[in-house]
Regions:
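Short acidic alpha-helix that forms the nucleotide-activated donor recognition element
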Residues: 14-17, 96, 115-116, 136-147, ...
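Membrane-proximal helix-turn-helix segments that form the acceptor-binding/catalytic region
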Residues: 3-22
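Conserved donor-binding/catalytic core segment of Leloir-type glycosyltransferases
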Residues: 68-86, 92-95, 106
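Acidic anion/phosphate-binding donor-loop and adjacent secondary structure
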Residues: 31-34, 40, 50-66, 87
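Conserved donor-binding loops in enzymes that form glycosidic bonds
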Residues: 21, 48, 78-83, 110, ...
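Nucleotide-sugar-dependent
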Residues: 86, 134-143, 150-171, 176-192
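Nucleotide-activated donor-binding/catalytic signature segment of Leloir-type glycosyltransferases, i.e.
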Residues: 73, 100-109, 114-141
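Carbohydrate-associated surface elements
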Residues: 28, 46-49
Length: 197
């Protein structure tokens, strides 16, 4: 461990132990950091939640057909941060292998890995991969409804490091979801709700 890591660990413990209370979003994060507390009673779980007034299957409005054209293709969608927490190589490989099928892939968002996706799209001629800017929040239920399946390819190093909060909005909109992350089921939702099989 480097001197920098040692110092940061000490700062982390100091913050935890000087605080009146600390919250985390699930059991995974709780179990990861609880041993760093002198008083574990300071650590509390407040789960992620969904605004069901916005995210529900009936809240659908027309989309810009220049961005989201009406076609009979199977549409797979990811919306959110395009970062290192996700593994984008399986997506690129999948788009390449299915380029002759009636399947389109939509990635909506920004992040440090967006340039990688755009580079792969250009180099490999992946015309059915659409990399789009963030869309207005009020349109997200409609965008989820536009697609047939949502997907999340988690990076292997993120195994069991919490649960993607976007899963809850997808579930609230009653859309199917494909999550890929090594050999393990994602997070603690399968254990709590009997899903993820």
């Amino acid at each position: 461990r480097s001197l920098q890591q040692t110092c940061l660990k000490k700062v982390e413990r100091c913050i935890y132990n000087k605080s009146a209370a600390i919250t985390t979003i699930d059991d995974v994060f709780y179990n990861t950091i609880v041993s760093r507390f002198e008083d574990p009673n300071k650590l509390h779980i407040i789960p992620n939640f969904v605004d069901t007034d916005l995210y529900n299957p009936t809240n659908v409005e027309p989309l810009d057909e220049n961005i989201f054209p009406k076609t009979d293709s199977l549409k797979l969608l990811y919306a959110g941060n395009i970062g290192h927490a996700q593994d984008w190589r399986p997506l690129v490989a999948l788009v390449e292998k299915t380029k002759d099928l009636n399947v389109e892939y939509f990635v909506v968002g920004m992040g440090v890995q967006r340039s990688y996706l755009e580079q792969q799209k250009a180099e490999k001629g992946l015309d059915k991969l659409h990399v789009l800017d963030y869309q207005p929040r009020h349109l997200m239920p409609s965008i989820l409804a536009y697609s047939d399946v949502q997907f999340i390819f988690m990076a292997p190093e993120m195994e069991m490091m919490g649960f993607p909060s976007k899963v809850y909005t997808i579930m609230a909109c009653e859309r199917p979801l494909l999550i890929c992350s090594g050999d393990k089921r994602r997070g603690n939702l399968p254990d709590c709700y009997g899903t993820g099989r």
